[in-house]
């Protein structure tokens, strides 16, 4: 039976640690994506899908972008709602394999690169925490440092938080599992695919 190459074993191990991210894996002058990530990125960005010998009988699906010009590609993926993990080469070699590590995760609400920012609008990340009788929320634009925190204990929590989401227009929402239950009753989440809840 064929066996994966050491580099591909490391890639898959890293991908297991970041399953919800598109993994930009640095190989020389390119960030490469493999397997499902390559298929997704190829489709979303209209890049050529190729293959790489990986130790298996079939070549691994692969696509890539130049490391010196990766920002526009990441920006397009972020705008489509994806998270991107940037995996860089280190100076270490172990068993003749260049070591790599994830140095950054870019999400719609954590963009700070001026190349990827739209200067005419804020880039808010919002957190919602729902308990039995109240809802708390915080939002921040990490590119400017603006931040706000509030709590609401009144009636009709669903309408209240819906109004706040529409007013703030966050690029990303993170929430606890109780707040996730609001997803089915918040009109803004039903009608605008921009708003996505990430449960933590």
Regions found by a protein language model. Name each.
Residues 1-200:
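Basic, polar low-complexity surface loops/patches
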């Amino acid at each position: 039976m064929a066996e994966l190459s050491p580099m591909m074993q490391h890639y898959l191990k890293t991908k297991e640690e970041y399953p919800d991210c598109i993994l930009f894996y640095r190989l020389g002058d390119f960030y490469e994506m493999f397997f499902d990530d390559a298929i997704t990125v190829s489709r979303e960005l209209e890049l050529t899908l190729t293959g790489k010998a990986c130790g298996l009988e079939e070549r691994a699906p692969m696509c890539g972008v130049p490391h010196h010009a990766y920002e526009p590609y990441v920006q397009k993926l972020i705008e489509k709602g994806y998270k991107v993990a940037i995996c860089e080469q280190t100076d270490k070699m172990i068993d003749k394999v260049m070591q790599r590590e994830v140095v950054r995760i870019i999400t719609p609400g954590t963009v700070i690169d001026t190349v990827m920012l739209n200067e005419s609008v804020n880039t808010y990340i919002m957190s919602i925490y729902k308990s039995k009788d109240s809802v708390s929320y915080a939002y921040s634009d990490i590119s400017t440092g603006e931040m706000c925190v509030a709590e609401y204990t009144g009636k009709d929590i669903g309408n209240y938080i819906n109004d706040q989401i529409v007013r703030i227009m966050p690029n990303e929402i993170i929430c606890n599992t109780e707040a996730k239950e609001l997803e089915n009753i918040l009109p803004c989440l039903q009608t605008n695919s921009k708003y996505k809840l990430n449960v933590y």
